[in-house]
């Protein structure tokens, strides 16, 4: 039950990093 909150936080963090990486690649391109 303690791990119910971790997946969403990790997923949002991953997504946020992924979006930043995409924006950086698009800006660099």
Curated annotation (Swiss-Prot):
GO cellular component: photosystem I
Disulfide bond positions: none
GO biological process, one term: photosynthesis
Domain of life: Bacteria
Keyword annotations of the record: Photosynthesis, Photosystem I
One Pfam family recorded for the sequence: PsaX
Membership in a protein family: Belongs to the PsaX family.
Name of this chain's protein: Photosystem I 4.8 kDa protein
UniProt organism field: Thermostichus vulcanus
Phylogenetic classification of the source organism: Bacteria, Bacillati, Cyanobacteriota, Cyanophyceae, Thermostichales
Gene: psaX
């Amino acid at each position: 039950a303690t791990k119910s909150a971790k997946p969403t936080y990790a997923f949002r963090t991953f997504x946020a990093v992924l979006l930043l990486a995409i924006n950086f690649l698009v800006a660099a391109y």
